[in-house]
């Protein structure tokens, strides 16, 4: 089973990135963004909150200065892109289409001020699809209207796969009952998100015939197999990387031991069949 990182959760120039099957960059926007005021990260019950604000150098600096250094790590590169209009996504994908070292583009459809109604998501994916021939994975939020309906919409618009799920909005207060994050609320991630993420993956796997990267609380091999059981072809590690940067190697080893313990079969290149039930005597996953 392939292991990636969730966008923004690992520095691509560090040793742990070399243990991934693919590296996913932080989200890149057309123009540079300074990001949100600090504090930007807070540890909370069941996970963490983050409010980075899409800080990045912009697409031109990324392509010129950042991407060449990431390529040296030696793993396939997925670039996460985000914008505020269909034109933004088209611009980003058109620029990345020129980059041979980019194997896949992740469309972050959960950006601030981008309404993730199915018709809006479809419009954004269609604009990206017209701008590039590279594989496109649509990253969806669990706080969407009907995630299965949104999955069908982005599939019809040309998405090649799904990344499920992004964070869900949360708020934490300090001892003085003030927000612990500089921007107030932030994205909630970690183990507490896993049941929500599993439900979203299961719903989408039954709705569309696309590969799915499952994420949201994956901390060990058992978590990864649970995502495979509900339809994920691969998993991405996020919050766990902040406390255990070596998690990719550990989770990979645990997947192997768990498959022997519970008798699951991971067949490379094949997605699980989830048409009848979320549990199976045999599960196949890419």
Give residue spans per PLM region.
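N-terminal capping/small domains of soluble enzymes
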Residues: 1-76, 83, 251
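Hydrophobic faces of well-ordered beta-strands that scaffold small-molecule active sites
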Residues: 3-7, 23-25, 77-81, 105-107, ...
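Glycine-rich beta-to-alpha transition loops that act as phosphate-gripper elements at the mouths
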Residues: 8-9, 80-84, 140-146, 165, ...
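Catalytic cores of alpha/beta
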Residues: 14-17, 91-96, 144-157, 206-207, ...
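Glycine-rich phosphate-binding active-site loops on the catalytic face of alpha/beta enzymes
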Residues: 28-30, 107-111, 163-171, 217-218, ...
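C-terminal helical cap(s) of enzyme catalytic domains, especially alpha/beta-barrels
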Residues: 35-45, 173-186, 228, 240-266
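Glycine/Thr-rich beta-alpha phosphate-binding loop at enzyme active sites
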Residues: 48, 109-119, 150-210, 250
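Alpha-helix-loop-beta-strand connector modules within alpha/beta enzyme cores
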Residues: 57-73, 119-138, 182-212, 251-260
